[in-house]
């Protein structure tokens, strides 16, 4: 494939899409009119009220026999991951969680219309792990990283044990390294065939948060800013965003700007924001407002295209997994673990069927 076939270009030279199924999907959304974007959102019933207390939506609010029946049609489960963190005077400390839960609820609604509803489960980290610079900030509750990892591994194991062996964790908080560590620890410890994925949803559709392009946000995605507040205005119930209380604040950098990128890697800089500490003040001292950016310029319309993009991308993720591994099947045990197929056979049976064994009966492995 030549260079001209590798990339799908746009009217902005800094924004290109890879010529793959994913890239072509993103390019399609990029080229859509505002009316077409509204039609995508309508497919997913965006916006809608939160469904956490609505029967037959989350695993935890669906009666058991329905959970099992649905899993036999679609055994992918998506979980939102967030935190409790000060997001300024104008919005809520659960913003990261609610962004993710509203997104995955939309994916569930759309797949349910197709008769193959993806499973969704409650947020396993409602308080969250945090980077060092969050310490001491009122309104932010920090869980130690090792506790968060262990908690996530336990959730992964419990879901796997119940037949949910394809898991996707959608994150909107500065803790991706903790989620990645949990994935690897789960596989170290249990060595079972599974597909477990984590992603920062905003980074997954980063092109749609580039500042100053295509009627989108005008400032880089950071924290409680124009980007996050716009998403909240589109997705959240009335009263969870109050622009009249919005404040503007920015981080003081000790080093020249250009090395460390923002939350969505908008500038293609050499390093992610999370790859250093100490080169800027901690939040309590540097941005006590709980904001990095200019949330007062937020509008729900600015979030429509990125939300359409993540909804369609997550649907594609589910489709790709199930196309390769239909419900009840997993990757080849002897290719993705050091256990034998015979050893794992009882553990891979339908839970509670004759001969089935629980994941907790497996001989422990790991480092």
Show the residue positions of the predicted features.
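Extended, histidine- and acidic-residue-enriched regions that form the cofactor-binding/catalytic faces
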Residues: 1-143, 150-166, 172-367
